[in-house]
Amino acid sequence: MSTIKKSGIITICGRPNVGKSTLTNALVGEKIAIVSNKPQTTRNRIYGVVNRGDTQFILLDTPGLHKPKSALGDYMVKVVTSSLADVDCALLLVEPIPHVGAPEKALIERVKEEKIPCILCINKIDTVEPAELLPVIAAYNEAWDGFDAIIPISAHSRSGLDDLMQELQKYAQEGPQLFPDGETTDQPERQVLGELLRGKLLL
């Protein structure tokens, strides 16, 4: 019998190549999303499923935030913004750079409009010294002082992921299990294999 009593729908947003797919794969525990150094490798929302204790998390891995330059790019940006509808929490994933760009500011404004809890995740902390994170945190706090939490992580090395999952527990809602035990994605197996092959071709 399932012990799941709560669920949380979490959308992961950020610029291309900031590590959204790496984070999704790390939290799920297997590779369901493309990881590539080429931008816009995730074209649709990918649902990852993570069971932790009595809670089931549904992760929405979205395309990267960018200024669209094509019909496909425009569609991908719409996927990002639509993913903020009916979620319990948004993760803004950023690199450890002390600058808040236009894409991040636009997402912050959308989160404020929707009144969605938002966690700032500073990724790739394994590439900088701890002291270098302070100006990054200061820059984002200056842009918006409404983040519900700021959590430094490394999706690659898994550093900080336990802290992140513990924070996400706060936003889970009482309710039924949405996906069966053992299911890690809503994507058909054939589509997952196709996406992973596409990821290899993009490397």
Predicted regions span which residues?
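Long, well-ordered amphipathic alpha-helical subdomains in the mid-to-C-terminal portions
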Residues: 182-203
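Conserved nucleotide-binding/hydrolysis micro-motifs of P-loop NTPases
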Residues: 39-41, 63-66, 96-100, 125-128, ...
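Conserved, well-folded catalytic cores of nucleic-acid-processing
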Residues: 30, 49-53, 68, 83-90, ...
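Conserved G1/Walker A P-loop phosphate-binding module
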Residues: 1-89, 94
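Canonical P-loop GTPase G-domain recognition
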Residues: 116-117, 126-189
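Conserved C-terminal guanine-recognition region of P-loop GTPase G domains, centered on the G4
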Residues: 51, 56, 78-150
